[in-house]
From Swiss-Prot:
Keyword check for Ribonucleoprotein: yes
Family: Belongs to the bacterial ribosomal protein bS16 family.
GO BP annotations listed: translation
GO MF annotations, alphabetized: structural constituent of ribosome
Protein name according to UniProt: Small ribosomal subunit protein bS16
One Gene Ontology cellular component: cytoplasm
Listed HAMAP family: Ribosomal_bS16 (MF_00385)
The entry's keywords: Ribonucleoprotein, Ribosomal protein
Source species of the chain: Streptococcus agalactiae serotype V (strain ATCC BAA-611 / 2603 V/R)
């Protein structure tokens, strides 16, 4: 089972709000998911992002692949550098 970390669209028409979910790659975008690991609100001036770092690092270490947008959000939050350091420090 290929697992991805990707965005799920929530909110109403013209006012998107996203959840950062861990889901099977074959599941629909807004369909079944395994776990919610964060949120992303692009409408706020500073693009409010909340991330459960421990859970994201655990899923990345298990082999979950982030989507391009999620990878950018994780990089800006500093999670990808922590994952890189954790992976190559051994």
């Amino acid at each position: 089972m290929a697992v991805k970390i990707r965005l799920t669209r929530m909110g109403s028409k013209k006012k998107p709000f996203y959840r950062i979910n861990v889901a099977d790659s074959r599941a629909p975008r807004d369909g079944r998911f395994i776990e919610t690991v964060g949120t992303y609100n692009p409408l706020v001036a500073e693009n409010q992002v909340t991330i459960k770092e421990e859970r994201v690092l655990e899923w990345l270490s298990k082999g979950a692949q982030p989507s391009d947008t999620v990878r950018n959000l994780l990089s800006k939050a500093g999670v990808m550098t922590k994952f890189h350091d954790q992976k190559f420090s051994k």
